[in-house]
């Protein structure tokens, strides 16, 4: 599979030994002889659904065969509290309960789930304690993209209304 090979080549480029790896030799020839120390890799971006979960499993299994400590970051889509995000979380927690994830990752997690969210400032303020009660079961969370600009909350977007003090306060409350 070309996609799987692309992931493996990317990791080899970032972390391989230039004396024994052609991809690491490319990195060296680009002026960076030392490995980057890549310890986690995202698989997809805002992907979700059964097809994505199946592809994630194929990619992460191939990665873990060669790099058992590499932490794979699973996409959960961009709609919190929707069935699509729940499917990703359920799958990630099931993987974390088995021996399928990373074995000795940089964070200690077996897998990381990347949530994205674009909502109103009020939604973000209300979600300030969102992750306080998340189970700590080997499936960590990374909130990789967010914006309190209201776009997905059905609010009209204007240059003046997209990023205001209200959106800054909503995001700040969320980050606490």
For every predicted segment, state its role:
Residues 1-66, 70, 74, 80-87:
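N-terminal catalytic cores of secreted or lumenal carbohydrate-active enzymes
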Residues 61-62, 68-71, 100-176:
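Catalytic-core region of carbohydrate-active enzymes that cleave or remodel glycosidic bonds
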Residues 42-47, 76-79, 117-119, 145-150:
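Short, flexible loop/turn elements at secondary-structure junctions
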Residues 25-26, 82-92, 124-130, 171-174:
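Short alpha-helical segments and helix-capping/turn motifs at coil-helix boundaries
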